[in-house]
């Protein structure tokens, strides 16, 4: 799925040394799964390498990544949007690990020599933070996606509440309310409210009520679509910030009205003062002139 040369920037000459022999990882890891390949479980390469005491090395010249001296198949690897590299369990098995599934299929024990670690097939849930305009997706306790979003603007606010993903899920949905507008990587949340991709996603509410994810960069919209399963809980909470209304408060100077009588009196006083001052100036000038 990803070519190894592209992984070079992230794993440039990276080598993880083995921990002391005999160590056993007592804590488990929450794995990552995807809706378009639901039976495959992934785990971050660096985490599993440390847990099993395996070396991980990227050869810059050949563009190949090895784990426990096994060259990984780049076509089987995935990434989180933050660049974290994920390796599937079958690649771990080819690298020399023993894979043992639990009876309920919700956990797998990965072992190598005297080291072992449990990887959980944890549940997924999504949190939409209206106040901070963020979408965070979790698998178990693992944060797998943290992206800025844009929700419903004033008059079209995104409703808070507890929802479930679906039932509509489409790589290209069309809006029935807004002139057949394209909504790529759409996941329905509630009635006409969808999580979907959009070209420009400002970090403030600007949509007609939907939750917009960026298509640019690592494409969080597509990543979320590939990851989320129908029926998984989606929590929308908080209140959109007041600043999201895109209005700026400008100080306004208000002239206080002056009653007509007071205004006339003021003018008379000013005129009188000016006249007196002028007369005094003329008197002083005339007096000095007569002395000369």
Q: Residues of each region from the PLM?
A:
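C-terminal membrane-anchoring or membrane-association module
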Residues: 278-292
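Bacterial N-terminal signal peptides that target proteins for export
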Residues: 1-8
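Exported/periplasmic cell-wall-interacting domains
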Residues: 157-160, 172-270
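Extracytoplasmic/secreted envelope proteins and their assembly/folding machinery
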Residues: 42-49, 89, 132, 146, ...
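Bacterial N-terminal signal peptides
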Residues: 8-19
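Extracytoplasmic
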Residues: 40, 60-62, 121-123, 130-132, ...
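A structural motif detector for short, solvent-exposed N-terminal "entry" segments of globular domains
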Residues: 112-154
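Primary recognition of N-terminal secretory signal peptides and signal-anchoring hydrophobic helices
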Residues: 21-123
């Amino acid at each position: 799925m990803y070519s190894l040369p592209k992984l070079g920037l992230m794993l440039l000459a990276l080598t993880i040394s083995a921990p002391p022999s005999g160590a056993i990882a007592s804590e488990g890891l929450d794995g990552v799964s995807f809706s378009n390949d639901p039976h495959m479980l992934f785990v971050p390469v660096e985490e599993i390498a440390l847990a099993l005491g395996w070396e991980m090395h990227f050869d810059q010249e050949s563009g190949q990544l090895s784990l426990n001296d096994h060259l990984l198949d780049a076509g089987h690897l995935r990434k989180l949007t933050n660049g974290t590299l994920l390796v599937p369990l079958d690649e771990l098995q080819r690298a020399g690990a023993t894979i043992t599934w639990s009876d309920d299929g919700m956990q797998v024990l990965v072992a190598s020599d005297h080291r072992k670690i449990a990887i959980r097939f944890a549940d997924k849930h999504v949190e939409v933070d209206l106040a901070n305009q963020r979408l965070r997706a979790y698998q178990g306790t693992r944060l797998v996606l943290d992206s800025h979003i844009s929700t419903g603007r004033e008059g079209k606010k995104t409703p808070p509440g507890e929802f479930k993903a679906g039932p509509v899920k489409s790589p290209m949905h069309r809006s029935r309310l807004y002139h057949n507008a394209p909504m790529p990587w759409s996941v329905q949340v509630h009635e006409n409210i969808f999580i979907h991709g959009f070209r420009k996603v400002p970090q403030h509410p600007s949509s007609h009520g939907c939750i917009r994810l960026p298509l640019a960069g690592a494409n969080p919209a597509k990543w979320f679509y590939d990851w989320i399963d129908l029926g998984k809980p989606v929590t929308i909470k908080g209140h959109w910030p007041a600043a999201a209304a895109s209005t700026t408060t400008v100080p306004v100077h208000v002239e206080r009205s002056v009653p007509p009588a007071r205004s006339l009196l003021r003018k008379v006083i000013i005129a009188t003062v000016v006249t007196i001052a002028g007369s005094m100036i003329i008197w002083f000038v005339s007096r000095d002139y007569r002395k000369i």
